Amino acid sequence: MPFYHSLGQLPKKRHTQFKKANGGGLYREEVMGLEGFSGIQSLLYHHFLPPRVKTVELLGETKPAYVDFGPIRHRAFKTADIPKGGDPVAARRILMGNNDVTLGLSRPTQSMDYFYRNSQAYECWYTHEGSGVLRSQFGVLEFKEGDYLVIPFGTTWQMELSGPEARFFVVETPSHIEPPRRYRNEYGQLLEHAPYNERDIRVPDKLDIHTDRGEFEVRVKVRDTISRHILDHHPHDVVGWDGFLYPWIFSIHDFEPRVGLLHMPPPTHQTFQGRNFVLCSFVPRLYDFHPDAIPAPYNHSNVQSDEVIYYAEGNFMSRKSIDRCDITLHPFGLPHGPQPGATEASIGKTRTDELAVMVDTFHPLNLTADALELEKPGYQDTWMADDGEGSFFTAG
């Protein structure tokens, strides 16, 4: 994140003696940072030596297996009934991706009984359904429906669900996930025209310190593999930390939509950026207010980007063939837009109650076999219907 945060006990000066009470020895300092020593970092103070690992075991590979895309066409996927079960990490199913980003879903029914560390990617978990607690060495974050959980490289975390199940749309990338640069000044502060403010970002506000000894499983993802590390101490043994690298939460319900005289393009709704992709939030808002405005989007061609939309809630549900939890993929180079009759039907509308997450990628996406199993046939043909009373979704 672009702002500094500290939590817990810290020595007055970094890299100096920080002693435990009652002659208990030194706390162990760890510098955790990105891009060598040139990126954002945090300093953490542990009860135990961070490198202590009893045993290591390779569990398997994690690289997605992509299938032949077939003829280029618009596609839709019905995900409401994806299999549920397992913990959030185990339940994840990757549907599409490229070298810059993977997109998937998770529908867990239980909390994690191990710890997870993705050392090769940032992760962003959009909470569509459910609530719970994300615990990490940086502290505790409570999450609920609508929250984006942004988890940076190297975070050792565990997710505890509050209810019997949850549903997430998951973005994973080997680059940073951060607010768009155009929203920030040269010092990293969010500017007045940004659609959210630092006050909207929730950071860990309390530590959950453990000094337990025993056997604790940490599953480490790196080099497209998962390894099981058994520690002889609880990994959340941090008594204090400070810096710029830590997990955080932003709620889609805190996004401040921009409206205009005429239809606003999708970049207006951008929420985060990564390398070669953007993430946008479509939220309830007023429509355009020119007397001759057409609220439905104009037809457009993604000449250099693939567009993926995850439909969470709202008025898109009346659109032909699109339901809650569906995903659409509009690939490179093909025009898309309102279905027949939708443009005319939008005239006179004053607001929308839609809620959706969009990811635009600047390199083509590949599909997995899981995606093909969920595909809804005939989506490409929905533009062939006769004009009439149609429906529309204002994201495109």
Which residues does each predicted region cover?
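Jelly-roll (double-stranded beta-helix
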Residues: 1-396
